[in-house]
Amino acid sequence: MKLISWNVNGLRACLTHGFAESFAALDADIFSVQETKMQPGQADFAPEGYTEYTYSAEKKGYSGTACWCKTAPLAVTTGIGLEQHDHEGRVLTLEYPGFYLVNCYTPNSQDGLKRLDYRMEWELSLIHISEPTRLLS
């Protein structure tokens, strides 16, 4: 199984710079992206043979994760189940027979470490929910 993970820093911008061609050439079974910075329906990207799963931030143009899969997962979960963390579209979990793929976009601590406390709290929360899983992305 071929897994790809890519922080695109804005999927709409990447689509104008060869992302679709790279996606096709890599021919992954599961293609995970982080920092999509978009809401569903904002980009025309529907690769043939793949099913898309997305998790967008409530704030438009911010964060977000997505996966394209050749084989549908058993289950898809968005977020980590904690309201204080689940508004930024950072964690998309796919369950397959024998493994979980956790596609996550970790918060940046920002200049001057303004969000360091939040990031540390977020990481502890992610570790708590991921104990029974194997982090792949």
How would you name each of these model-derived features?
Residues 114-126:
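Binuclear metal-dependent hydrolase catalytic cores centered on His/Asp/Glu-rich metal-binding motifs
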Residues 127-137:
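Single conserved hydrophobic/aromatic residue that forms the stacking wall/gate
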Residues 37, 43-111:
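Structured beta-strand-rich core segments of catalytic domains in phosphoester-bond hydrolases
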Residues 12, 74, 136:
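Nucleotide phosphate-binding site architecture
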Residues 20-23, 47-50, 85, 118-119:
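Glycine-rich, phosphate-binding/catalytic loops in enzymes
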Residues 6-13, 79-80, 118-120:
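Short, flexible loop segments at the rims of nucleotide/cofactor-binding pockets, characterized by
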Residues 1-47, 57, 62:
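N-terminal, active-site-proximal structural segment of metallo-dependent hydrolase catalytic domains
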